[in-house]
């Protein structure tokens, strides 16, 4: 198992790229790589800036999360500005990711290059619904204790960030981790949160559920055969939310597990077993 340490005024690398840093007023840990993230702790309700842009605010406990997408540059400056004018900042080195190619054949042509006008109109409606759901911004820090895998048993069949070729046609990168499992396997919430979307019959995703874990950190569960939650519902870590299926664009029963922080696609597997820093900063 990988461990992380928090060392004052320094960075620590302890196995597999797990990093931690602490400077007065700001503690960080996480996976600082493309597709990775940083958990942070600072002053309660401090504004958090990434490369000079205000993107989130710390919770009442001073906790926050930021993400680094597949194309993130080689560094990121994290700055916290407390309610009383105090500031703290760190610059993180973001490691490059390694993204293999994945070839998928045997998909219905309508799910790869749809041309039917009615279908295209339906896809546009579904994109709008998903976009709205991904704007969910629940206050709080349900991510603070990290994440579990959503399935008890599974086999990883496609890595996050891989460049896909579908029926011989190059497609956008795959922003999910595919977990093959028997049809009907129980999908469980990997962390506490609120359901931002629960919809069956999506053209590409089939049965789709989104969970908001706070501050714009949202996980997605695709291709479900059954959904057991409703939009707006609070869920707890380990609670059953649905069943594995092969609905939408899928060639076999599996769960496509995704994660977004605001508009950035993250690798959910990197967050499994991570916890936010425990250092507490009180207001001066």
Feature names for model-found ranges:
Residues 21-97:
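Ser/Thr-rich low-complexity repeats and stalk/linker segments
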Residues 53, 69-71, 83, 95-97, ...:
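Solvent-exposed coil/turn segments that connect beta secondary-structure elements
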Residues 186-197, 228-244:
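Short, well-structured beta-strand-loop connectors
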Residues 190-225, 253-258:
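Zn2+-dependent peptidoglycan hydrolase active-site motif and core
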Residues 235-253, 257-284:
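Extended, charge-rich intrinsically disordered regulatory tails
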